[in-house]
Amino acid sequence: YAAAMHDYRFKEMEYTLPGEYLQEQEIERQRKIHDSLITMGLELISDCYLNVLGTQCSERGIELQRRMMDGKHHIELIKDIEAQSYDLTVMGVVGVGKTRASQIGSVCERVVRNCARDFWVVKHVPKERDVPRDTVLVAIDGSPQSFGALVRGIELAKRFDKRLEIISVYDPYLHYTVFNSIVDVLTEKAAKVFRFEEQNQLHEEVIDTGLAQIYQSHLNIAERMAEEREVEVSKTLLDGKAFHKILQRVEDDPPWVLILGRVGVHKLKDEDTGLGSTTENLLRMAPCD
């Protein structure tokens, strides 16, 4: 909770108070009253939230450690997560300030982007009549993070008796877009230096075919990893823009959970990107956890 923020905002609005409240002694008295009520009130509200969670944990035999912090939400959460050794942090994708147009709340976005930890972002809250979702879908691109996601996916599929599906997407179309965008601007001399026609043919005959083989090999390795842990798995290789194809897949048949690495195979060794573009797009747009 953010009692300090309320205190700051109250002081900003003091000049709007009626005249009888603008005397120095009266303003100071009102500040103390406001600070006491807000701090106490927010502590009570936070405690009530934890009481509800505590009851649910007790009913399921789960131990609960209660923690409350005063400060800017995402800042305090990041400090706490980085200071602890949590196996998993679970957050709702939006908070109480959501609107119909909200894709992701500011707290969720900032915490997930700035903490290099495992997160489960809850986006789907099942209703009583909903058909249960039964698939753990893992996206593989060959990066260490994606295979880390696979290990988590295998564990979840076994523990919760879910189907495991792995998906990989390669993009053979990007070079066509790039080549078409430069063909009209290259001078004859530049085209010769660049060996435009040879480069185009190289991509068509070698690189695009090679990409398909590379990503298929990632799927094959992932399949063996699952089978070694006695988990049945289905695998899918698609071509196109990664986030778009994965989004189409989860929109057509939403899984129980989609698991992704924070970053992908194109991350540079010393690059601190926060989240990769595919992960960030799907975090916003996928209709599933």
Label every PLM stretch briefly.
Residues 1-33, 58-65, 134-202, 227, ...:
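Small/aliphatic-rich secondary-structure junction motif
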Residues 4-16, 20-89, 204-258:
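Structural beta-alpha unit
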Residues 47, 71, 101-102, 143, ...:
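Short alpha-helix boundary/capping motifs
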Residues 53, 111, 149-152, 156, ...:
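Hydrophobic residues within alpha-helices
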Residues 66, 72-129, 244-289:
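Gly/Ser-rich helix-loop-strand patches that form or flank binding pockets
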Residues 170, 239, 264:
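Active-site-proximal loop/turn and secondary-structure-junction residues that shape catalytic pockets
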